[in-house]
From Swiss-Prot:
Taxonomic classification: Eukaryota, Metazoa, Chordata, Craniata, Vertebrata
Name of the encoding gene: mt-co2
Gene Ontology CC entries for this record: mitochondrial inner membrane; respiratory chain complex IV
Function recorded in the entry: Component of the cytochrome c oxidase, the last enzyme in the mitochondrial electron transport chain which drives oxidative phosphorylation. The respiratory chain contains 3 multisubunit complexes succinate dehydrogenase (complex II, CII), ubiquinol-cytochrome c oxidoreductase (cytochrome b-c1 complex, complex III, CIII) and cytochrome c oxidase (complex IV, CIV), that cooperate to transfer electrons derived from NADH and succinate to molecular oxygen, creating an electrochemical gradient over the inner membrane that drives transmembrane transport and the ATP synthase.
Source organism: Xenopus laevis (African clawed frog)
Name of the featured protein: Cytochrome c oxidase subunit 2
Recorded topology in the membrane: Multi-pass membrane protein
Sample GO molecular function, one term: copper ion binding
Catalysed reactions, as listed in the record: 4 Fe(II)-[cytochrome c] + O2 + 8 H(+)(in) = 4 Fe(III)-[cytochrome c] + 2 H2O + 4 H(+)(out)
Amino acid sequence: MAHPSQLGFQDAASPIMEELLHFHDHTLMAVFLISTLVLYIITIMMTTKLTNTNLMDAQEIEMVWTIMPAISLIMIALPSLRILYLMDEVNDPHLTIKAIGHQWYWSYEYTNYEDLSFDSYMIPTNDLTPGQFRLLEVDNRMVVPMESPTRLLVTAEDVLHSWAVPSLGVKTDAIPGRLHQTSFIATRPGVFYGQCSEICGANHSFMPIVVEAVPLTDFENWSSSMLEA
């Protein structure tokens, strides 16, 4: 999860987030090199006296400053398109969960189970126990098995919402009357925090998302206990 004074991204907990981190570093390096080159050219132009005010045509220079930006954009666009297609793929999910946004809480339905559904509300600050995080904890976490492809169906009951968990590299809009689909694989056990990322009313800041990734045996025990409750 995020820490005070953190400048970088949260630690990746899914293959997609790993790809996004690599793409961020790749793009940042390209932007840094371009900025350095442009700053160097501007500095040279402002300081040198070797200028030709009568120069009207320079096809070689024009060709260079046309081809180089095109190559740079292609180098940035190709990895981006690859990740875009990877994020759109849903290959043989082991578990399907439907997340429904409400004002101002989330509800979850595990479609692989007949009667496994629950609401997830933020725990008020006065009810937090030592070690819990303010404005991020919920009474019912969305539990998923780690290292298992999970499909997430996202919609909303009333207004626009957005289901987002940065560590998993997932952000999907929840729109009333529409069903959006995404997928993720939690590569390690842990608790991953997110929040609604679409302004949805007065209590928009108070509808957090908590995903808990556990081993498959623990998930089966949890689902059995939820069905018996």
